Design a protein with these regions (language model features):
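Short, structured segments at the rim of ligand-binding sites
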Residues: 1-435
Length: 435
C-alpha cells in the first residue's frame, strides 16, 4: 500500500499497444467480503482484485475473528464460523466507504451492529439515509451518533419488508440485500439499482444458499433463509477498470485488447467512445479498442446503470479535453465530482465547471505538470492525462488509485506506457512481473 510520499512519474506522448487482462470487480468484491460474515462455513472467493480496499476489508474480518487465507494472489479462503459479535476495528473502518456493508451483514448474523461512518473517496455528499431506511423497515433501530452507526433488532432477527428507495442507490441496494438474506420472511426492494456488481453480490449469496431473485432489475425479491453454507465463487471482471483502459487507449492513441471482460457490461462506455470516433470491437470475453486520430466532441451525462457510469466520468472527461470542439459533461449521480478539473487545467486543459456540469473545450495537446489524485477515479483520470501530455507528469496521492486498480503501473507499462512508481523518492518499476 502506498504512503503519502509515493508518486507516479509519467513521460507522455507514447501510443498504447498490447493486451491487458482485467481483474475482478472492485465494487463487487467490497460487498462480497462483508457478506461472507454471514456464511456458516468456509467460502473460497476467486478472481479477487489485488487492491488496498480488499486488503482492508479482509483485515476487518480478521479483526472480528475470521480466518482469512490467501490460496493464490487472487483467491482467498474465508472462515467466519468462529466470529463472535464485537466492534470492528475503528482505524480500518474509517478509511473505506464499503465498510458500511458490515451494517447489513452484522445485523443479519448478530441482530446488532456498531460501525463507524464510512470513509473512502473524498468527493460529494454520499449519505447512508437509504441504507438506514431499509434496515429500519426490516425492524432495526438505527442511530447515527458521533461518527458511529448503532443498530440492533429488538426481536432478535430482522424481518422481511417492502422497501421503496427514494433514489436509486447502489450501496443501499446491496446493503439491504445483505441484511435481508437471513431475515425472517420476504423482502422486496423497489427502485433498486441494477449495476452488474449488484447481480454479482446476489449470485454469490445464492451460491451459498440464499434466495434472491430479480437482481439486475429495479425490483429485487429476497426470501430470507435460516443459514448460508460454504462454497466457491468467482468475482466478475471489473467494468470500470476495463473502461479506464479503453479510454486511455482512445485518448493516448494506439490499439489495445482487453481480455477477461463481459462486453455487455461495457456497452454504455463502448457506445460513447464510438461517438468520439474510436473503433470498439467486441468478442466473446474481450474488447478491442483502436484509436483513429483526433477524437470527436460529444456530450456525456452520468446515470445509474445501464446509463454511463459516474465512475467513468473523470476518465472520459480527459479524453474530451483533447477532442475537437466543445463537449458538455453532466454529473447526474454525485455532487462535487469535478475536483480533478483544476488538476487538468494545470496541464493545459480548457474546462469550466458550473454546478453539476463541466464545459470542456478541446485543445490540441496537454503538457506535463505535478498533479494530485483527488480520489480513486480522478486519480486514474490524471494518469491518463499524463499519458497524453508532452513532457513529464508527476502524480501524487496515489494511495487513492491503489484503492481500486490492481497493478496499475505494471498493466500500463505492459502496453507501452512510460510510467514508473517512486516510493519515498526511490524509483520502482513495479512492473517487473509484467515485463
Amino acid at each position: 500500500m502506498s504512503n503519502s510520499l509515493d508518486r507516479y512519474v509519467i513521460h507522455g506522448g507514447r501510443p498504447l499497444h498490447g493486451e491487458i487482462e482485467i481483474s475482478g470487480a472492485k465494487n463487487a468484491a467490497v460487498a462480497i467480503i462483508p457478506a461472507a460474515l454471514m456464511v456458516d462455513g468456509v467460502c473460497r472467493i476467486e478472481n479477487m482484485p489485488q487492491i488496498s480496499d480488499v486488503d482492508m476489508l479482509l483485515k476487518i474480518l480478521q479483526g472480528l475473528g475470521a480466518r482469512v487465507e490467501y490460496l493464490s494472489p487472487s483467491a482467498v479462503e474465508i472462515d467466519c464460523t468462529q466470529v463472535r459479535f464485537t466492534e470492528p476495528p475503528y482505524d480500518l473502518m474509517r478509511k473505506i466507504r464499503a465498510s458500511y456493508y458490515f451494517i447489513g451483514s452484522m445485523l443479519g448474523r448478530f441482530a446488532s451492529a456498531k460501525t463507524t461512518m464510512p470513509g473512502g473517496c473524498n468527493f460529494g455528499v454520499r449519505p447512508i439515509d437509504q441504507h438506514i431506511k431499509g434496515m429500519t423497515a426490516m425492524g432495526a433501530n438505527v442511530e447515527v451518533k458521533n461518527g458511529f452507526v448503532y443498530a440492533d433488532t429488538p426481536d432478535g432477527r430482522l424481518h422481511g419488508a417492502k422497501v421503496y428507495l427514494d433514489k436509486v442507490s447502489v450501496g443501499a441496494t446491496m446493503n439491504i440485500i445483505i441484511a435481508a438474506t437471513l431475515a425472517r420472511g420476504r423482502t422486496v426492494i423497489e427502485n433498486a439499482a441494477r449495476e452488474p456488481h449488484i447481480v454479482d453480490l446476489a449470485n454469490f449469496l445464492n451460491s451459498m444458499g440464499a434466495d434472491i431473485r430479480g437482481a439486475g432489475t429495479d425490483s429485487i425479491r429476497i426470501q430470507g433463509v435460516e443459514r448460508l453454507h460454504g462454497g466457491t465463487y468467482g468475482v466478475i471482471p471489473d467494468q470500470i477498470e476495463a473502461g479506464t483502459y479503453m479510454t486511455a487507449c482512445a485518448a493516448a492513441g494506439g490499439e489495445v485488447r482487453l481480455a477477461n471482460v463481459i462486453p455487455r457490461h461495457l456497452e454504455c462506455i463502448s457506445a460513447k467512445l464510438r461517438e468520439m470516433g474510436v473503433t470498439v470491437v467486441e468478442g466473446g470475453d474481450s474488447v478491442l479498442v483502436r484509436s483513429n486520430g483526433r477524437l470527436r466532441h460529444t456530450n456525456v451525462k452520468t446515470q445509474p446503470y445501464p446509463g454511463f457510469p459516474t465512475d467513468m466520468q473523470p476518465q472520459i472527461s480527459v479524453a474530451l479535453c483533447l477532442a475537437d470542439g466543445t463537449s458538455v459533461v453532466t454529473e447526474g449521480v454525485y455532487d462535487n465530482r469535478y475536483k480533478y478539473i483544476q488538476e487538468l487545467s494545470r496541464m493545459g486543459a480548457d474546462a469550466q465547471v458550473d454546478g453539476c456540469t463541466a464545459i470542456i473545450n478541446g485543445v490540441e495537446g496537454l503538457h506535463g505538470a505535478e498533479v494530485r489524485a483527488c480520489d480513486l477515479r480522478a486519480g486514474a483520470a490524471v494518469v491518463i492525462a499524463g499519458l497524453c501530455a508532452a513532457g513529464e507528469t508527476v502524480v501524487t496521492d496515489i494511495r487513492f488509485i491503489e484503492r481500486g486498480y490492481e497493478n496499475f503501473v505494471g498493466k500500463l507499462r505492459s502496453i507501452g506506457a512510460d510510467i514508473v512508481l517512486e516510493r519515498d523518492g526511490a524509483e520502482q518499476c513495479a512492473a517487473a512481473a509484467a515485463e
